[in-house]
UniProtKB/Swiss-Prot annotation:
Keywords: Carbohydrate metabolism, Glycoprotein, Glycosidase, Hydrolase, Polysaccharide degradation, Secreted, Signal, Xylan degradation. It catalyses: Endohydrolysis of (1->5)-alpha-arabinofuranosidic linkages in (1->5)-arabinans. The gene is abnB. It holds the Pfam family Glyco_hydro_43. Residues 1-16 form the signal peptide. Belongs to the glycosyl hydrolase 43 family. The lineage of its organism: Eukaryota, Fungi, Dikarya, Ascomycota, Pezizomycotina. It comes from Aspergillus flavus (strain ATCC 200026 / FGSC A1120 / IAM 13836 / NRRL 3357 / JCM 12722 / SRRC 167). This is Probable arabinan endo-1,5-alpha-L-arabinosidase B. Its main location: secreted.
Length: 358
């Protein structure tokens, strides 16, 4: 028994050492949960926690607390999305908010590596399954209504998040290509307002211009970017006075081969910039604008966490909590086994830091 335990310990140490880290191993351990989920959004409503993630018709999970136990209770949509493009059965990267008693679930439909995409919205009077109405697309890129207008003619319209300031909504979205953008929502929160001129705000862009042969060779112009891959997506904006914080998922999100992982620091990680305006410009600690490739690394691979991303922030009695999906370094199985984790946030000189649990 001692020999088995020793061999297991040696195996564990060896495996964990083989997983590259972009954050120090001294980083506080993630608060792990039993929920397997990809690109989560978490809300607290009606005395319970709800998590929405990628899956058949946008799966809904419920728990008495953020730590769980979590159980799947149904889905947002009762059939495929009414948007006629992309993976209509399994919409991506949902984000759910509540405004004046109505719940809005924004979601993406697309195909991997292409920007023929759309963001849709469904509404309900309850955060749980049943009673949701799918209103279809509110913005599109690649093809479809409005896709030839700025900024949709240069973006990939996926990964929605919504910032609410007063009675106004701001749709934040984007992945690769020209990066992250923000446009105003109308009062109904189910349609987009005027996006011309200064109403469309460019928030972030990845500086990398790596060329990928498979992308260059793709005959579909909507599935290649002649300037190279720019891996930034999954944006989210939170507020902690006096700053707005733009959170980004930075680096390679998917298709991890445990025998050929990307170089350390090129896998998913969570970065942030701040601004006194909800529209930016957002800068990192060095004052570099996120549209120029800036971004402060807040949480990356460490300890048993590999490639955290798909993040959001939820505020509880003890303060702000950063939640995300991550892959487990131990017994690495890749993104298909990603689970929900969370970390407590503190603020030092106006910058968020990961801290120990209170």
């Amino acid at each position: 028994m001692v020999l088995v335990a020793t061999l297991f310990s040696l195996f564990t140490v060896s495996l964990c050492r083989s997983i590259p880290r972009s954050s120090p191993s001294s980083s506080p351990y993630t608060q792990a949960t039993d929920l397997k989920i990809h690109d989560p959004t978490v809300i607290n409503a009606n005395g319970a926690y709800y998590a929405y993630g990628v899956g058949e018709h946008i799966v809904i999970h419920q728990a008495p607390g953020l730590a769980g136990p979590w159980k799947q209770i149904g889905s947002v949509l009762d059939k495929d999305s009414i948007i006629p493009k992309g993976d209509r059965a399994k919409p991506w990267a949902p984000t759910t908010i509540e405004v004046k008693g109505t719940f809005y679930c924004y979601y993406s439909v697309s195909n991997a590596g292409c920007r023929d995409s759309a963001i849709g919205v469904a509404t309900s009077q309850s955060p749980g399954p049943g009673g949701w109405t799918d209103h279809g697309a509110i913005v599109q890129s690649g093809t479809g209504q409005g896709s030839d207008e700025h900024p949709f003619n240069e973006v990939n319209a996926i990964d929605p998040a919504v910032l609410v300031t007063g009675d106004k909504g701001h749709l934040v979205f984007g992945s690769y290509w020209s990066g992250i953008w923000q446009v105003p929502l109308n009062e109904d929160f189910s349609s987009v307002g005027n996006t011309t001129g200064l109403n469309a705000h460019h928030l972030a862009k990845h500086p990398k211009t790596e060329r990928v042969n498979s992308q260059d060779q793709n005959p579909d112009p909507l599935c290649r970017d002649s300037s190279g891959r720019r891996p930034v997506e999954g944006a989210y904006i939170s507020y902690h006075a006096p700053y707005y914080y733009l959170w980004l998922s930075w680096g390679q999100c998917c298709d991890y081969d445990p025998n050929n992982l990307p170089p350390s620091g090129e896998e998913y990680s969570i970065r942030v910039g701040r601004s006194e305006s909800p529209h930016g410009p957002f800068v990192d600690k060095q004052g570099k604008e996120l549209t120029q490739g800036g971004g402060e690394l807040i949480y990356g691979s460490n300890n048993d966490v590999y490639a955290p991303g798909g993040q959001g922030v939820i505020t509880v009695e003890t303060g702000d909590i950063l939640y995300y999906h991550y892959c487990e370094s131990l017994f690495f199985r890749g993104l298909s086994e990603a689970r929900l984790g969370y970390s407590y946030l503190g603020y030092v000189d106006g910058w968020p830091v990961i801290r120990e649990a209170p």
